[in-house]
Each structure stands twice: as C-alpha cells, then as structure tokens.
Amino acid sequence: MDVLKKGFSFAKEGVVAAAEKTKQGVQDAAEKTKQGVQDAAEKTKEGVMYVGTKTKEGVVQSVNTVTEKTKEQANVVGGAVVAGVNTVASKTVEGVENVAAASGVVKLDEHGREIPAEQVAEGKQTTQEPLVEATEATEETGK
C-alpha cells in the first residue's frame, strides 16, 4: 500500500507542478498580451494624432487660402466701389455746375471758369488767372 501511496504522492506532485507551470504560462501569456495591447493602443494613438495633425494643418491651410482670396476679392470690390463713387461724384459736380451756369446763378468766362460775383457787379468779366490744365495734382491742390 505504501507503494500505492507513494505513486499517488508522485502523481499529485506532478499534477501540482504541471498546474503551477500552466498557471505561470498563462500569466506570462496574459502579461505579453497586455503589453501587446498597450503597444497597439499606443501605436493607434500615435496614428490618430498624426492624422489629426495633418487634418488640422490642411484645415488651417484651407482657411488661410480662403482668407487670402476673400481679401483679394474685397480689394477688387473696394477699388471698383471707390471708382464708381468718384465717377458719380464727378458727374454730380458737373451737373450742379451746368445747372448753376444755365440758371444764371453763376457766370462763366469764355473758358468755362466761374467769374467771381464782385467782378460781375463791376462789369469785369475776365479773370487774370492763367489757364491750367486740370490734372489730378491741380485738383488736389486747388491750383
């Protein structure tokens, strides 16, 4: 019977040793799996961050392009508006001058320049000013 007990004792020790080795193997595999999952998660995070950064750069570049195009168009429209306003203002001034001259409110000399009211009252209807070609410089300075 001792032999039988001894045999069971060896078997028991073998099973315990096998169970311990299996447990250690499972723990090692679980640790490696956990590390693998962590590595995969880190790589995924890096990939997502890279894609996010590239997307952000693309959006910023697109916004900057749209901003520049909008500024260019605003400048074009602004220039056209200024030119239009200047044309309207010039035509308005011409119209007022024509109405004033036609109604007799203002007297003009032979060159189309206004004769001051004092000279009209005194009978002097000529001016002593030399003729000056109208240019932007003369219009700005008034000379």
From Swiss-Prot:
Q: Name one GO biological process term.
A: chemical synaptic transmission
Region annotated 5 X 11 AA tandem repeats of [EGST]-K-T-K-[EQ]-[GQ]-[VA]-X(4) sits at: 20-78
User: Its Gene Ontology molecular function terms?
Assistant: cuprous ion binding
Q: Which Pfam families match?
A: Synuclein (PF01387)
| Cited InterPro entries | Synuclein, Synuclein_gamma
| Gene Ontology CC entries for this record | axon terminus; cytoplasm; neuronal cell body; nucleus
Q: Where is this region: Disordered?
A: 113-143
- Where does the protein end up? Nucleus
Q: Where are the sequence repeats?
A: 20-30, 31-41, 42-52, 53-67, 68-78
- What keywords does the record list, in alphabetical order? Nucleus, Repeat
Q: Which family does it belong to?
A: Belongs to the synuclein family.
Q: What is this protein called?
A: Synuclein
State the species of origin: Tetronarce californica
Organism taxonomic ancestry: Eukaryota, Metazoa, Chordata, Craniata, Vertebrata
